[in-house]
Amino acid sequence: MNPDTLPYRPCVGVVLFNRDGLVWAGRRCEEKYTEYSEQPKRWQFPQGGIDRNEEPQRAALRELYEETGVSSVSLLAESRGWLTYDLPREMLGVGLKGRFRGQRQRWYALRFEGRESEIRIQPPPDGHHPEFDAWEWVRLVEMPERIVEFKRPVYEALAEEFAPFAA
């Protein structure tokens, strides 16, 4: 399969900061036949696709709620541009349901204004499929080492761009 013939999936992501400057990290549920199959580094930020005619910021808030139950947030910043990653060649045709070469993502830094009891991942609200099986607050600079290798450059860029909000 030639990756050049496949599009990037339009997505958003959220770096959720608590009042102490730590970021929310979720451990992806183990799934077969996805880009996370048999990956030891499954920790990531909430992210997901942009629906047709949906504004990216609205998509980010929706994805955050669907995956974590969190809605008590304030906007800190939006990434300067779109960040992309490519799936490894062996995952083409498998990861991202086989329809995309990778993702083109707009990222948002948000401040969590609620209580931790608001965070619900097992199960998430409104009957959504669980994306994560664990979560914790960590330092932003730790995240590039906790994510799957092919997403590391995106997380390194986020760690640099959103550093002013971090502990």
Question: What residues fall within each predicted segment?
Answer:
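N-terminal strand-loop-strand
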Residues: 1-45
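Unchanged
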Residues: 48-149
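Charged phosphate-binding loop/patch that engages nucleotide di/tri-phosphates or the phosphate backbone
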Residues: 140-167
